[in-house]
Amino acid sequence: GSRIYGTVPIGIIIGEEAIITVSTQEVKLLNDFIKMRVKGFHTAKKTRIILQIMYKNATYYLFYLKQIDRLSESIQKELHKSMKNEELLQLLSLEKSLVYFTTSLKANEDEKEKMMRLDVIKQYSDDKDLLEDVIIENKQAIDMSQTYGNILNGTMGVVGSIISNNLNIVMKVLTSLTIILAIPTIVASFMGMNVPVPLADNPLGFWTIILITIVITAAFTRFMLKKKL
């Protein structure tokens, strides 16, 4: 089925003696800190905690962006075999996910810049490298999200063109078949008129008319095939 990768907003409240994080649901990112899975994590260093949250957040974005890219490649391979609605809906879901990712990452970039300008956030020389890593990781995530989004958008456009082209081909074939099948009907209707018609008294007239009908139908079919109609 279709799968959408979403984002969850996290609020960070900076107090005199504590940092409080708020989210609408349980977040794996924060659990990494709670379970002490983050290297160099110290609750006494507020600035570092904020930077570490931002860095960890960017790495998670990169991780899921790579997942989206792999899933997109897999779906596109399936589309080469047979174009089903399920695969198209999956691509649409991934495209929506990338829109959410790009929007959230850009918002994070803006918030990071605002946060670093606040007087309440003390900046230490030891955290300079970590801040640079945060900037690099977040920028890389934004670039990846936009690139994958553009590729997926282009893919959806190509798929739409292929579907439209296939529909036109089917309509052409059906129209051609309708015209070809109409030829015997027209001949039969003409010969069935209550007026004198050629070959009416000929004992081989019926078979002659059948042969003429077949020849006309075959000639018209060949003409349409030659013109690729």
Functional labels for PLM-detected ranges:
Residues 1-118, 123-124, 133, 137-140, ...:
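Peripheral, non-transmembrane regulatory/ligand-interaction domains of membrane transport proteins
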Residues 34-35, 41, 127, 203, ...:
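A generic membrane alpha-helix/interface feature
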Residues 50, 87-90, 127, 156, ...:
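Alpha-helical membrane-protein architecture signal
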Residues 115-128, 154-164:
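Long amphipathic alpha-helical coiled-coil segments
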Residues 139-229:
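Hydrophobic alpha-helical transmembrane segments and their immediately adjacent juxtamembrane loops
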